[in-house]
């Protein structure tokens, strides 16, 4: 059994209205060996990929595919490859369901195996791995098909890692789904998060949560924490006192002038990188300064704000979500060491590396060790049952934090404050980092401070909070880019056939041009726009 040809259809095609991969396979001798004639094959397949039990196949119910495997005649290997390729993508976090296997108009033993995909590289790899799975579990009398070593668990882990590398981030994926729900087509423009929404002159672009409507000057202001603080201060909005410093000694002097504890952070930074909070000694300030300057040569020393850490998301001038961010932490059970508790936390399937999943793994770094040392603890210490220990001082999800939805609880004064702040910076989508004792009470009453305004804020904490109600924060972005009634498609015509395709295309283009349209045309001769 081997793959003779691979075709990728990236748009509507003969088989489906969505992208599919078509493999031309030759079963060779296996044409005479459907699953019913391969003793133990089905059992070994289901032992290796037990989630295939959920495939309905032609029976449209769980277990349908398994019934096909066990029927008197069984099913052929092309059909098996189709289902494995689909399931591998599902296991890697890509929800695809469509597939079909057909042998019409092909030589005996050859079949077209068609299955859907989201990421092309992942879909192609799924087909290759599916073939290797089949060859590996063939019964002994067919073992001469492939005798190379094969560790399915390791192969699956490598495949999932490939899928995670190629997958859209959570925020971009949510925006793409919101576009699909509104029948807005989208195209990925690079291997990162740059996505085109809509076609032609109606298109918009997003890169994560930056949009084609985001002003560059607004992003520049938001990235300059000192400038942001000054603008907000001029409007009478609550901000901490801060200074820019250029060497460790100056950082210590400013910290002493502000009064300990203080915060040290890079002037231009993201995702909480090199942000050190609650610094209480000159030595800690010097150490934090050195780390911050690796991110940006200009460093900020800021008064430390006590209270809870909130992210207020503002889209198109309106607060759409609020989350309380809780720093990465462990909870004692009276038996396990702190190191073991961290391992247990990271076993949560929702946690991954970086921004690939809903939550990020907790990493024990210098900041965590400093907090342990200050508390007289080590990684080998055992916490009493129920005792919470924070391994971070900031609640960024990118450093292992969790989120609690507070959208319905924000006080009206705090909502207005956040909307004014984002409007002052000029962002269409902005995240306000706000520290206060209680978001349900006005900052005018209990105090609080805006410590940062974020361009391109992450959506993870709102889409999938650890506690509370998930919020649709992607929909408002799409509705802002494409208000109700606005167009997002241009008329497209596809011309196919045996002969005369280019001539017919030119004729149609000419007729449309005479009607006053600016026509784009792609033929075997080249690509033309308005005749050029």
Predicted feature locations:
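ATP-dependent carboxylate activation and anion-phosphoryl transfer catalytic cores
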Residues: 1-181, 318-321, 326-333, 337-340, ...
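Active-site nucleotide/adenylate-binding loops and adjacent lid/helix of ATP-dependent enzymes
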Residues: 39, 45, 204-366, 370, ...
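Conserved N-proximal alpha/beta basic substrate-recognition cap immediately N-terminal to
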Residues: 115-257, 270, 512
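Short coil/turn connectors at secondary-structure junctions
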Residues: 182-183, 258-260, 296-297, 308, ...
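A short, glycine/Asx- and small/polar-enriched loop/turn
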Residues: 198-203, 256-259, 314, 442-449
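C-terminal helical accessory/scaffold domains
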Residues: 364-383
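Phosphate-binding loop of NTP-binding sites
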Residues: 482-532
């Amino acid at each position: 059994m081997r793959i003779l040809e691979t075709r990728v259809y990236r748009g509507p095609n003969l088989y489906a209205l969505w992208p599919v991969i078509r493999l031309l396979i030759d079963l060779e001798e296996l044409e005479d060996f459907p699953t019913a004639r391969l003793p133990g094959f089905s059992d070994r397949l289901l032992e290796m990929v037990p989630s295939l039990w959920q495939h309905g196949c032609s029976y449209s119910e769980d277990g349908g595919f398994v019934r096909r495997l066990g029927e008197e005649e069984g099913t052929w290997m092309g059909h098996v490859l189709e289902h494995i390729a689909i399931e591998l993508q599902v296991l890697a976090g890509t929800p695809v369901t469509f597939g079909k296997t057909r042998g019409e108009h092909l030589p005996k033993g050859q079949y077209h195996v068609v299955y859907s995909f989201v990421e092309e590289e992942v879909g192609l790899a799924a087909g290759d791995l599916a073939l290797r799975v089949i060859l590996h579990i063939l019964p002994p009398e067919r073992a001469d098909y492939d005798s190379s070593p094969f560790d399915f668990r390791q192969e699956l882990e490598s495949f999932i890692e490939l899928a995670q590398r190629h997958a859209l981030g959570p925020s971009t994926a949510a925006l793409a789904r919101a576009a699909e729900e509104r029948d807005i087509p989208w195209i990925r423009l690079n291997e990162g998060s740059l996505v085109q929404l809509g076609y032609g002159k109606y298109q918009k672009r997003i890169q994560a949560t930056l949009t084609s409507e985001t002003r560059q000057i607004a992003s520049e202001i938001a990235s300059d924490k000192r400038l942001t603080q000054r603008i907000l201060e001029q409007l009478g909005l609550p901000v901490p006192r801060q200074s820019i410093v250029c060497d460790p000694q100056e950082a210590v002097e400013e910290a002493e002038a502000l009064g300990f504890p203080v915060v040290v952070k890079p002037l231009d930074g993201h995702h909480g990188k090199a942000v050190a909070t609650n610094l209480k000694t000159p030595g800690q300030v010097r150490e934090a300064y050195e780390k911050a300057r690796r991110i940006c040569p200009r460093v900020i020393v800021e008064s430390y704000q006590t209270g809870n850490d909130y992210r207020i998301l503002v889209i198109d001038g309106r607060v759409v979500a609020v989350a309380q961010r809780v720093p990465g932490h462990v909870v004692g059970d009276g038996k396990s060491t702190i190191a073991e508790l961290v391992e247990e936390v990271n076993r949560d399937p929702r946690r991954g590396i970086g921004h690939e999943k809903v939550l990020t793994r907790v990493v024990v770094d210098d900041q965590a060790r400093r907090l342990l040392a200050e508390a007289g603890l080590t990684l080998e210490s055992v916490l009493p049952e129920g005792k919470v220990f924070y391994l971070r001082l900031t609640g960024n999800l990118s450093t292992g934090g969790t989120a609690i939805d507070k959208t319905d609880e924000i006080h009206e004064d705090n909502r207005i404050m956040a909307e004014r702040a984002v409007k002052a910076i000029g962002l269409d989508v902005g995240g306000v980092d706000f520290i206060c004792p209680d978001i349900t009470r006005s900052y005018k009453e209990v105090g609080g401070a805006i410590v940062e305004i974020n361009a391109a804020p992450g959506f993870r904490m709102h889409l999938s909070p650890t506690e509370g109600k998930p919020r649709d924060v992607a929909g408002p972005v799409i509705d802002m880019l494409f208000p109700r009634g606005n167009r997002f498609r241009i008329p497209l015509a596809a011309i196919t056939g045996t002969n005369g395709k280019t001539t017919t295309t030119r004729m149609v283009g000419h007729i449309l041009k005479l009607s006053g349209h600016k026509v784009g045309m792609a033929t075997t001769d080249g690509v033309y726009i308005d005749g050029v």
